Amino acid sequence: MSSAFDWRAKAACRDKDPELFFPVGNTGAAYQQIEEAKAVCRTCKVIDACLKCALDTNQDYGVWGGLSEDERRALKRRAMRARRSQAMQMQI
């Protein structure tokens, strides 16, 4: 049976300290930590699956799929606006 998390066995982060991907805050030292986590993500073969999982399961914290918490929130907002715009155009 396949799981939504099967991709994790191939993830570049699998042997890294998980705390690297969950900084506290988003400025100063936390910003540097976010950038270090993203650098690991950039080398990952399953970055897209990771991001999809984070979005599908509403992961609000940490770096997933190469995106920070703020970046994923912005991505969700853009997607929501695009869906609304498309729905409004279909009503016209």
Swiss-Prot record:
One of its GO terms (biological process) is cell redox homeostasis. The keyword DNA-binding applies. PROSITE patterns: 4FE4S_WBL (PS51674). Its main location: cytoplasm. It comes from the Bacteria. Residues 12-74 form the 4Fe-4S Wbl-type domain. Keywords: 4Fe-4S, Cytoplasm, Disulfide bond, DNA-binding, Iron, Iron-sulfur, Metal-binding, Transcription, Transcription regulation. [4Fe-4S] cluster binds at C13, C41, C44, C50. GO terms for molecular function: 4 iron, 4 sulfur cluster binding; dinitrosyl-iron complex binding; DNA binding; metal ion binding; protein-disulfide reductase [NAD(P)H] activity. Induction: Low level expression in exponential phase it increases about 8-fold by late stationary phase. Induced by heat (45 degrees Celsius) osmotic and oxidative stress, nutrient starvation, tetracycline, and bile salts. It holds the Pfam family Whib. The Fe-S cluster can be nitrosylated by nitric oxide (NO). Upon Fe-S cluster removal intramolecular disulfide bonds are formed. Its cofactor is [4Fe-4S] cluster. HAMAP family: WhiB. Acts as a transcriptional regulator. Probably redox-responsive. The apo- but not holo-form probably binds DNA. This is Transcriptional regulator WhiB1. It comes from Bifidobacterium longum (strain NCC 2705).
